[in-house]
């Protein structure tokens, strides 16, 4: 459905000073919430970044058990430990919900590599099963999930 090995990489020096720069610590674990937005002008970042676009699903491959996944609300760039996915005809919030599901988190954790800093490998990510109901059903599922989470808060 998406390729876990493909991301558009850019040098930090090529980014506009007003670009949104997303780092791992900006995403709350297990919630899908953005904690803060930083701009290039506020950082001293010199490392390469992955580009992303509004509507992309941003997935942290580092320490998959932290379950850090958001949907981008504007274009920007992120650490190379975050993968930017364009799910095309799949509802992006449904894709986010699936990537955050216990099923996928367990799958990602079962074959991560690295002891101190485990990561989900591209091959394992590409082989993941992805249940794909019709688009209207994807929207209904997300609406139900959001309704249940509202009741929790």
Annotate each PLM feature.
Residues 27-29, 64-65, 90, 135, ...:
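Short, glycine-/Ser/Thr-/acidic-enriched flexible segments
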Residues 1-14, 131, 135-143, 150-153:
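Non-catalytic DNA-recognition/assembly elements of restriction-modification systems
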Residues 110-114:
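Short amphipathic beta-strand starts and helix->beta connectors
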Residues 2-12, 20-54, 72-74:
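Sequence-specific dsDNA recognition surfaces
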């Amino acid at each position: 459905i998406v390729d876990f090995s493909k991301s558009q990489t850019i040098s930090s020096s090529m980014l506009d000073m007003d670009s949104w720069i997303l780092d791992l610590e900006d995403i709350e674990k297990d919630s899908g919430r953005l904690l803060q937005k930083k701009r290039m002008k506020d950082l001293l970042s010199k490392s390469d970044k992955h580009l992303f676009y509004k509507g992309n699903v941003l997935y942290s491959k580092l320490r998959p058990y932290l379950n850090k996944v958001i949907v981008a609300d504007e274009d920007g760039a992120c650490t190379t430990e975050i993968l930017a996915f364009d799910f095309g005809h799949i509802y992006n919030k449904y894709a986010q919900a699936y990537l955050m599901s216990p099923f996928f988190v367990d799958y990602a954790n079962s074959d991560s590599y690295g002891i101190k800093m485990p990561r989900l490998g591209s091959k394992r990510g590409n082989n993941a099963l992805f249940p794909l109901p019709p688009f209207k059903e994807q929207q209904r599922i997300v609406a139900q999930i959001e309704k249940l989470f509202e009741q929790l808060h």
